[in-house]
């Protein structure tokens, strides 16, 4: 990976909450409060990332709200509505060898055990029982597929993930 990695998006700022600069936070982390384990945040305003710190946060029903340092009015909060929340990639914890961040799998080439190039991972869908790779097939797919959905079940369908080569080896029939 390059030394200048893209920030990792962990959530998004929603609408303002109250009149004292609080913001509703949409989080993409496993637990709702997990986004607050990271500091500082980067928020993207008008295409540029800038660093911010969370002054306070709390649960509001099933959601969370936060107050950022330097944001103390409703107008200042409203100006941040829909900004993405990210952290530098180097803040992400190292995972065990057999676990992967979704962001690292997106863009990987998917090849089956017979050598057929199934396409490229476009996104990953959380289904409850297991994650599913949404693979966009190559333009001239020999089986007439536009996309494939392959369950991310290691040792059953996922045989090997090589992040350095950006390839995922699967035991999957290309006609599915």
UniProtKB/Swiss-Prot annotation:
Chief place of localization = cytoplasm
The UniProt GO MF terms for this protein read:
ribosome binding
Name listed for the protein in its UniProt record: Ribosome maturation factor RimM
HAMAP family, per database record: Ribosome_mat_RimM (MF_00014)
Question: Which residues does the UniProt record annotate as the domain PRC barrel?
Answer: 97-176
Q: Which InterPro entries would you find in this protein's record?
A: PRC_barrel-like_sf (IPR011033), PRC_RimM (IPR056792), RimM (IPR011961), RimM_N (IPR002676), RimM_N_sf (IPR036976), Transl_B-barrel_sf (IPR009000)
| This protein's UniProt keywords | Chaperone, Cytoplasm, Ribosome biogenesis, rRNA processing
Coiled-coil residues are none
Offer a single GO CC term for the protein: ribosome
Please quote what the entry notes about the protein's domains: The PRC barrel domain binds ribosomal protein uS19.
Please cite one Gene Ontology biological process associated with this protein: ribosomal small subunit biogenesis
Does the record bear Cytoplasm in its keywords? Answer: yes
Family indicated by similarity: Belongs to the RimM family.
Subunit structure, as described in the record:
Binds ribosomal protein uS19.
Q: Where in the cell is it found?
A: Cytoplasm
State the protein's purpose: An accessory protein needed during the final step in the assembly of 30S ribosomal subunit, possibly for assembly of the head region. Essential for efficient processing of 16S rRNA. May be needed both before and after RbfA during the maturation of 16S rRNA. It has affinity for free ribosomal 30S subunits but not for 70S ribosomes.
NCBIfam families given for it?
16S_RimM (TIGR02273)
Q: What is the lineage of its organism?
A: Bacteria, Pseudomonadati, Pseudomonadota, Gammaproteobacteria, Alteromonadales
């Amino acid at each position: 990976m390059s030394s200048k990695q893209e920030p990792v998006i962990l959530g998004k700022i929603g609408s303002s909450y109250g009149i004292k600069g609080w913001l509703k936070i949409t989080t993409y982390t496993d637990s709702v409060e997990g986004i607050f384990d990271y500091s500082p945040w980067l928020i993207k305003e008008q295409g540029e990332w800038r660093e911010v710190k969370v002054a306070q946060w709390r649960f509001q029903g099933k959601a969370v709200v936060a107050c950022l340092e330097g944001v103390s009015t409703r107008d200042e909060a409203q100006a941040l509505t829909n900004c993405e929340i990210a952290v530098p990639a180097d803040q992400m914890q190292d995972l065990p060898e057999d676990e992967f961040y979704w962001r690292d799998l997106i863009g990987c080439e998917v090849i089956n055990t017979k050598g057929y190039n199934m396409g490229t991972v476009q996104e990953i869908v959380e289904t409850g029982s297991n994650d599913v790779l949404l693979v966009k097939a190559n333009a001239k797919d020999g089986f007439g597929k536009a996309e494939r959905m392959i369950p991310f079940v290691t040792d059953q369908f996922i045989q090997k993930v090589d992040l350095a080569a950006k390839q995922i080896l699967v035991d999957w029939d290309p006609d599915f």
